[in-house]
């Protein structure tokens, strides 16, 4: 699938292992993984950060193979679901950073253009999440209140 605002094709991706079974050397079982996710989620970590920690520290390649559920689903069942989805959160964070940069550098025309592109992606993603009922139907991105969302 191609990039939205760039000429690149974006074809490289990570390869998942063919076997979907848990490796024999893994010492954690499904309950231990769930407890680790709960503990890390209470610290305020995002699902991708939790996955990185589980991969690097505990040797869990895919939580779904061990537990049968993805990290976000486990967090939802425990009640630690983030208010806004992670990808939307990071895009809002990027827009806030660009806006802060533009306050100091008013003549940065390319920065202004990139802000428009990022905000259009935010609106598109928000529309998708509203149709999937992840965000409430009255949720709206406003640049004036965006810094409070990512604070």
Swiss-Prot record:
It is found in: Cytoplasm; Nucleus, Nucleolus. It comes from the Eukaryota. CDD domains: Ribosomal_S15p_S13e. One of its GO terms (biological process) is ribosomal small subunit biogenesis. The keyword Ribonucleoprotein applies. Pfam families: Ribosomal_S13_N, Ribosomal_S15. Keywords: Cytoplasm, Nucleus, Ribonucleoprotein, Ribosomal protein. One of its GO terms (cellular component) is cytoplasm. SUPFAM superfamilies: S15/NS1 RNA-binding domain (SSF47060). Gene3D superfamilies: 4.10.860.130, S15/NS1, RNA-binding. GO terms for molecular function: small ribosomal subunit rRNA binding; structural constituent of ribosome. Component of the small ribosomal subunit. Part of the small subunit (SSU) processome, composed of more than 70 proteins and the RNA chaperone small nucleolar RNA (snoRNA) U3. Component of the small ribosomal subunit. The ribosome is a large ribonucleoprotein complex responsible for the synthesis of proteins in the cell. Part of the small subunit (SSU) processome, first precursor of the small eukaryotic ribosomal subunit. During the assembly of the SSU processome in the nucleolus, many ribosome biogenesis factors, an RNA chaperone and ribosomal proteins associate with the nascent pre-rRNA and work in concert to generate RNA folding, modifications, rearrangements and cleavage as well as targeted degradation of pre-ribosomal RNA by the RNA exosome. Belongs to the universal ribosomal protein uS15 family. This is Small ribosomal subunit protein uS15. It comes from Drosophila melanogaster. The lineage of its organism: Eukaryota, Metazoa, Ecdysozoa, Arthropoda, Hexapoda.
